[in-house]
Structure formats: structure tokens, C-alpha cells
Amino acid sequence: MNLKQLSSITGYSLATVSKAFSGSNEISKETKDVIIKKAKELGIYEKYNKQKYQKMVIAILCPEIESAYYTDILSYFHKILAEKGCVATVSVTNFSASQEAELISYYSSNGKADGIIVIDAKSKSKKYSEIPIVYLNANDDASEHVDCINVDFNFGIEQAINHLKENGHQKIGYIGESLTMDKYDAFIKAMNKHNLLINPEFVVIEKNRFEDAGYNGFKKLWDKNNLPTAIFCAYDYIALGVIDFLEEKQKKVPDDLSIIGSDDIQIASYRKIDLSSIKANVKSICEISLSILLKKIKNPSYKVLQNVTVKSEFVQRNSVKNLNQN
């Protein structure tokens, strides 16, 4: 039994039923009493009673909390929600579609949250959540049944590859890992668009993650004695791992190798290298996601689905050498 079914049974709109549980003064006491009485008869009063905790609770499902990219997103969400007088609760999905679906069901059905945000959604379930839900970066078919906010990494990566080409680079490599195949696809598209040869010898998909992926990935290229002049890394931690390897070999960026990262994390600016990177515009995607979610929480009858794409952008710094000046 959910609020929509209670709405049908009592004859009141879904918005009115929701207001009865939130303690709203916008409906009469008589109307509220009828709805609450029926809810108690049906055994769902405790499930939906929100008066025990007046602040709005937003459940955020996140693949992990080790990555700076995800912690940046969570930090923005916490900041914005605090400013709006709301509370965030975070659950980790471990990149698992089944775990994600279980958490959606948990928060949706037990009244523990008013709305849900799913970061990098993996679940392909077509079921509607019983409470408002927004996907932040989702699979292609998700927009058919849920609001989706997606980052277009293709745009920023295309800008990055164009920057490398304009600076005379033809031998461009890629280092990523199994969880970054979307960026690998974007890299391939960008290389093809600019008519640049993709050398399989310059592509590494590492089993390791973070700095280890960059260090071990570039070591594999180094051992082949046939290096590219530039490397695009799926995220900045990978780029930092490449830099660590180069420093051990007493090589410098960009003199000996040009590097571009992705996600534009703050930690990259603390290193000696002023790393060029792809910015995901985290602030924008968080603000848009919450705007849509809070609107639907406050107005349950609002059913319009939105599919918003936010472009990434290439942030040029000083980690690319201009080969045209040689």
C-alpha cells in the first residue's frame, strides 16, 4: 500500500494525502483526520508519518566514497541541502545494480526519506519509486521512467583531444580502468573526429584503480620502448600515478610527456604539475538535480519527466607541450 493507493481509496488527491502526513496547514483538520484514520486502519500510518521529524530527508546513493569526484558531489549536495534546511543520508552501492535497486526500494517503501538521488545509476529497473527520485548520470533507458541529469564528457574530451592536436600531438595514448569505459568511448570518438590514429599499443585498461592504475598503466607503456607524446587519463588520480612514475625516472611533465586528466579534482592543483583536466561542472548538476527533486517532493502531482544534459569542459593549464615549436 502506497500514498497513491491511499489517495484512490479516500478520494483525495495525492497532493492532499501527502500534506496530511507532513502536518501542512494547507488542508483542513477534518480532511486530515479522514486520511489519517484510513491510513491507520490500513496499517500504513507509521510508514508515512513525517511529523516525528520535520526536516526533509534526502537519501543519496553513491557508488563509493573513495573517489574525489564522488566526494566533491556529496560535498555540494550536503552544502545545498543544509542551506535549504534539509538533511542528507548517504548509502554506498559499490557500483552494484542489485544493491542500488535494494536501497531504492528500502528508502522508497519505509518512509525513511522524502526523496532519492542516485549517482551514476546502474539499475535498469522500470519500476517507479514510491517517492520522488532523480538519477545523476544513468543508463540510456532510465530517462523513460525517471528524471535524469547527465554529464556529457564527450564535449570536454573532444576539446582536450583538439587541444593536443593543435599542439602537434599525433601519438596520443589512453589510460583508464574497467569503471571508466564511458570515457574510453568518448576518447575513441574524439580521436576519430580529429582523424587521429588510435594505436592499440598506446591504450591501457588497468585492473588497478586510482594512482596505481596510472603508475602501473604507464609502466606497461614504458616497458614497450614506444611511448606516445601525450596521455589522456580517465581521471586525475590516474594522471597523478603517471606523474609519480615519471618522477621516478627523472622525467618531467610536459617536457617529456604531455598529460590531460579528467574530473578536475582539487588535489591535482596541490602537486607540482599544473594539470589540464576535464571539468564535470559538479555544482551545476547538483543544483539542477535538487531543484527537480525538491519540486516533486513539494508538489506530488507534478509528473513531468526531465532529461537534462550538462556539458563538461576542458580546463587548459600547463601540462601539454607545444610540439609545433620544436
Kindly give the residue locations of the regions a language model identified.
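Flexible loop/turn connectors
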Residues: 219-326
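N-terminal helix-turn-helix DNA-binding module of bacterial transcription factors
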Residues: 1-54
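Short beta-strand segments enriched in small/hydrophobic residues
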Residues: 16, 51-66, 163, 171-177
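Short, solvent-exposed amphipathic alpha-helices that sit
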Residues: 69-83, 156-159, 179-197, 213, ...
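Short beta-strand elements in bilobed, periplasmic/extracellular small-molecule ligand-binding domains
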Residues: 81-93, 173, 188-212
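Alpha-helical recognition/docking segments in bacterial nutrient-uptake
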Residues: 55-162, 222-223
